[in-house]
């Protein structure tokens, strides 16, 4: 099968005349690969910074006023108390789960910070934090830490389906998501 060319006969003859006496160069040099920017480092650094920023809000010194009677619950002052009722009834189903079993208090704070950052980044409104029973250290501290974070709108003891009194359902304030504009 012949190759189709768009050059005229005169142009082809001129090209052959100009290329007469040339020879193919032997490739004996090293091929340089283009330098690639390490993409994976930037997000990892950003994630670590988000975790540190989010866990910065958690203090062991501050004791917010939480209801000590009945199930553990909290609603930020600017949020409707109906949201806690929805959490209690299980109207919200969590999309992310965090299991704090076996973690130290420092690790638990970091993981809580990472969870809140992930919820905001992924536009997840509801998450479940399983603190367990254990020695009651994390069970007591987790609500105190969550009440201090400005992006936590409300939390309530989880329904039995999600862990009962060994877990909390948390409502996270997320930025309004807008779809990208089409050109």
Swiss-Prot record:
One of its GO terms (molecular function) is RNA endonuclease activity. Residues 98-173 form the Smr domain. Its EC number is 3.1.-.-. The keyword Endoplasmic reticulum does not apply. Gene3D superfamilies: 3.30.1370.110. SUPFAM superfamilies: SMR domain-like. One of its GO terms (biological process) is rescue of stalled ribosome. Keywords: Endonuclease, Hydrolase, Nuclease, RNA-binding, rRNA-binding. It is an enzyme of class 3 (hydrolase). InterPro entries: Smr_dom (IPR002625), Smr_dom_sf (IPR036063), SmrB-like (IPR022990). It holds the Pfam family Smr. The keyword Repressor does not apply. Belongs to the SmrB family. Associates with collided ribosomes, but not with correctly translating polysomes. Acts as a ribosome collision sensor. Detects stalled/collided disomes (pairs of ribosomes where the leading ribosome is stalled and a second ribosome has collided with it) and endonucleolytically cleaves mRNA at the 5' boundary of the stalled ribosome. Stalled/collided disomes form a new interface (primarily via the 30S subunits) that binds SmrB. Cleaved mRNA becomes available for tmRNA ligation, leading to ribosomal subunit dissociation and rescue of stalled ribosomes. This is Ribosome rescue factor SmrB. It comes from Escherichia coli O7:K1 (strain IAI39 / ExPEC). The gene is smrB.
